Amino acid sequence: MSKTIILLAFFLSIVLNVQISFVVAESKVYVVYLGEKEHDNPESVTESHHQMLWSLLGSKEAVLDSIVYSYRHGFSGFAAKLTESQAQQISELPEVVQVIPNTLYEMTTTRTWDYLGVSPGNSDSLLQKANMGYNVIVGVIDTGVWPESEMFNDKGYGPIPSRWKGGCESGELFNGSIHCNRKLIGAKYFIDANNAQFGVLNKTENPDYLSPRDFNGHGTHVASTIGGSFLPNVSYLGLGRGTARGGAPGVHIAVYKACWVQRGCSGADVLKAMDEAIHDGVDILSLSLQTSVPLFPETDARELTSVGAFHAVAKGIPVVAAASNAGPTAQTLSNVAPWVLTVAATTQDRSFPTAITLGNNITILGQAIFGGSELGFVGLTYPESPLSGDCEKLSANPKSAMEGKVVLCFAASTPSNAAITAVINAGGLGLIMARNPTHLLRPLRNFPYVSVDFELGTDILFYIRSTRSPIVNIQASRTLFGQSVSTKVATFSSRGPNSVSPAILKPDIAAPGVNILAAISPNSINDGGFAMMSGTSMATPVVSGVVVLLKSLHPDWSPSAIKSAIVTTAWRTDPSGEPIFADGSSRKLADPFDYGGGLINPEKAVKPGLIYDMTTDDYVMYMCSVDYSDISISRVLGKITVCPNPKPSVLDLNLPSITIPNLRGEVTLTRTVTNVGPVNSVYKVVIDPPTGVNVAVTPTELVFDSTTTKRSFTVRVSTTHKVNTGYYFGSLTWTDTLHNVAIPVSVRTQILQRYYDEN
């Protein structure tokens, strides 16, 4: 009977909903983008938004019910709940640039700074010269912050910069007057667009705090990686022990919570957070957020972070963003606009070897984050029935086959938690998983889960098959760091080329993003408020921390100058001089589509010698060069813009890289460099051409003095290939013996244009 009632009620609800849908059209959240604001008074901007909605909806009450956000600082626009027909009507108003549906974004996730050479050291170290980042303000758009973490204590801080116009909002378990301090100077949260799209947050289904407080720890981890205070004797399950700190321990942090557990990040909320951050006076914006391909063009307001970033950069605020976690597949990058600093993820010179000793006394070193007691010699098994040795199929085995034993399995694809769950449910004592390297280690305190590659896994399998009673001993993980551990681009890190504009190299730079130890909220799996996380989300704040230090030392540098300094001084080998590899289905030498300019080298970036600088006008010319229409460019700028005729070449955009996706015959391009090193300098060119490609630079020498700080040069590139090829890579370096200003060169020959080759 109860089932009948439930089904009847469900059926009636469907019928009623269908009937209502004929009467009331469904409202959705739309972003109405108006471009550059016409008033300096934010209240006047908001009033103009209300007037526009009033003309459409007919009453003040309807306007207040509809409007979600007013964007009134970095640009003009608003988010509102509208029906499809209302959105169409408002899009036809002459002052409206574009009306777009709301979009959703995802979050991407001790030793790091020493590995990169950013150590307190002596008075000549980068940290000391940059005064730890004091007086610089970084804005972090993420899941919020856990303010009680000691990483956010303000001991030794002076006053908050007088230019700061932001504040701290109170909310659930967050008191703005108590939880903010001279380090954590700002905390706001944005959920209106998320609520408008999905309904009011149901905390039973989606546990979170209606405040800037961080529930899952992602935002806390990011913020503490950028600027966490010094905290000694920190570890995770006993591993990675050392002094934890952020890259710029003296920076002021402003947190903007726009991402919510299980509901992601509403584009309209993120855009509002960016608008507020611009108004509040942040010096840098850090976004560990991603979308997935296919992407929208940079001039399309549906690419909300790109549009918001453009307005931030136009006001001198560098925007650092994650490359995405869809690797190792090519063309999977997000945040690809040329004005954004896009970050890939690498490992570092630290690993967690875990000794596996077989009954024949052979010891194999796997990788794990296992902090439990040593597992003495116990039974070892590999399920031999068809497919059941597959990690995804372990649950198909009888529990008796795994109970009381360590299980070996093979994973053909990225491993999931299914294998761990199956073994634990069967009463198994541990799991050895043979797989391609992904660097994603699941931390477990009392259950050994150890990863090995297929070769070592096969060795273990041969041992199992060679004896009637195979046994194994697994020791607790240890921490190993130093030159014996090489650097690799992480498997998950998204790869180029750029799917929107292939002549724009992405990613720009790489930084450690694997097993990064930082603060986290106590709601998550942690050890004393700290945890290891991996992702381009974790690499992004590493770069943001370096940008803070550069901004402290060079407050007059533009966002493009900072990007240039980082890209042109990057390591193309790891700090120990070993080649950097890129992990994937097979391991290969890393190239610019894996790591951009290379692995970030903070100490060198401070004194790059030369920079490839750009202004907002250069970005406008870029938009013209890739055939975006005058109308779409005008939408971004908020003012009428007419591209020159003929249009400029995208290859002439003054990037610290050269990427030619469709070379046929010969092409000539131009770059301009600005001297920021010794006044009287002479640089000579060194060319490492891509295979089968000729590169000639004119002039081959650049002379700078007190009256000449800028020099232009041309690059003539021609191919000797007679067929369509893949990309080949090289470099172009200007050197004065003190500085080596290197940019990557990526060239693909396309005899048949716009041709996709399956072979």
Curated annotation (Swiss-Prot):
Gene (UniProt): SBT3.10
Main subcellular location: secreted
Name of protein: Subtilisin-like protease SBT3.10
UniProt family annotation: Belongs to the peptidase S8 family.
Domain of life: Eukaryota
Stored PROSITE patterns: SUBTILASE, SUBTILASE_HIS, SUBTILASE_SER
Enzyme Commission number(s): 3.4.21.-
Signal peptide start-end: 1-25
Enzyme kind, highest EC tier: hydrolase
Ranges for domain Peptidase S8: 112-606
A single cellular component GO annotation: extracellular space
Sites carrying sugar chains: N175, N202, N233, N361
The keyword Hydrolase belongs to this UniProt entry's keyword annotation: yes
Swiss-Prot/TrEMBL GO biological process terms: proteolysis
Active site: D142 (charge relay system), H218 (charge relay system), S537 (charge relay system)
Stretches assigned to the PA domain: 390-464
Pfam families per UniProt: fn3_6, Inhibitor_I9, Peptidase_S8
Keywords: Autocatalytic cleavage, Glycoprotein, Hydrolase, Protease, Secreted, Serine protease, Signal, Zymogen
Alphabetized InterPro entries for the sequence: Peptidase_S8/S53_dom, Peptidase_S8/S53_dom_sf, Peptidase_S8_His-AS, Peptidase_S8_Ser-AS, Peptidase_S8_subtilisin-rel, Peptidases_S8_3, S8pro/Inhibitor_I9, S8pro/Inhibitor_I9_sf
Inhibitor I9 domain mapped to chain residues: 29-106
GO molecular function, one term: serine-type endopeptidase activity
UniProt keyword annotation of Glycoprotein present: yes
Cell compartment(s), UniProt: Secreted
Residues making up the propeptide: 26-108
